[in-house]
């Protein structure tokens, strides 16, 4: 299951999964509650560079916007009889905490592995709101992988798919490409983390 609220990204997503009958796409974003919200984008940049957290003090001059639909994932999954979720990938440009707040029932019941982006501006005292939220919900193991260093793609969505496939293989196929391994994070450095993998269990046992 894939969620993408942006019009252009959703069209790219449909092209990517056209031959994959086992992938279902929904034109929604995820949040702590169901709502409509404005998504700000850059028309002359890759289509993944967008945010719902617009600030006039930002060093990014967004020049385009669209109204998108956000859903609480717990409610959405219950309404659509979706269960047994074992892996979640989140890339929402500093909106991670709101997404996580909408998955509290899911993470308590299914205990999925969660991969998310953590930007440096959200890290304070070697932690963040998202990391603290996960720790309070018994996610005590955090990892990074060298594959998460961003490659150059015309559209960010292609990078996301490439990284997602790799992370899935590293976690669930233990003998996959041993040149790329996950590394446990014992102390969060003050830096950008393209991918953090959070788990309620030790993935290196």
Regions picked out by a protein language model, each given a short descriptive name:
Residues 1-205:
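Phosphate/nucleotide-binding beta-alpha loop and adjacent structural elements of enzyme active sites
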